[in-house]
From Swiss-Prot:
Belongs to the CCC1 family. InterPro entries: Ccc1_fam. Induction: No significant changes in expression observed in response to short- or long-term iron deficiency in nodules. GO terms for cellular component: endoplasmic reticulum membrane; membrane; vacuolar membrane. Keywords: Endoplasmic reticulum, Ion transport, Iron, Iron transport, Membrane, Metal-binding, Nitrogen fixation, Nodulation, Transmembrane, Transmembrane helix, Transport, Vacuole. It comes from the Eukaryota. The chain crosses the membrane at residues 55-75, 83-103, 145-165, 172-192, 205-225. Its main location: endoplasmic reticulum. Highly expressed in the fixation zone of the root nodule. No or low-level expression in root, leaf and stem. This is VIT-like transporter 1b. It catalyses: Fe(2+)(in) = Fe(2+)(out).
Amino acid sequence: MANATPNGSVPHNHVGAVLPTIPTIKIDEKQTLATSEDHTSIDYLQRAQWLRAAVLGANDGLVSVTSLMMGVGAVKKDAKAMLVAGFAGLVAGACGMAIGEFVAVCTQYEVELGQMKREMNMSEGGERDLETEKRTLPNPLQATWASALSFSIGALVPLLSAAFVADYRTRVIVVVAMASLALVVFGSVGAQLGKTPKLKSCVRFLLGGWIAMSITFGLTKLMGASALE
């Protein structure tokens, strides 16, 4: 076995071969801390303001338009009737979601801003703190666009699914299957952006969509059978 020489030279074994030295790996603590700080610096409460509108819009667009198309298909099996009803639901729903979200978030913004001003007036340096705190308030325009755009994306899923299927039964099966897949995807994306459990979110989306579609199809089928025949 090789022994270290007193002058610190590279040790040799008994046959004269140089023993390799194992380099020490140094962890860059500054880089690790910077990565950790970047991850923890994400304001998930700020993200939740537009994420809530986007998740609500996507789920509402998908479920409402799918349910509307299935309801129309329950009494009229024509593909054109289902597509026209779905497109009308997309336009009306996107506009309604955008206006409703804008009014709701504007009201929330005004209430929170008024409360914030009252609290700042009671403390010193309130004007300076007010400008900083206003950045945490919800943005009405951001929520409006997120809601309208996500509603349209969700509503396009059943429309595109039914557009290329001629047979009624096959069309309904394809629409339900694609809507179910989209519900799982929306639930997973929402959970990923909000850092919440994915399984719980996907199950919640899926069950809610199935219940809405079942109720709409069943009641419309019952009404059509009793009133139109």
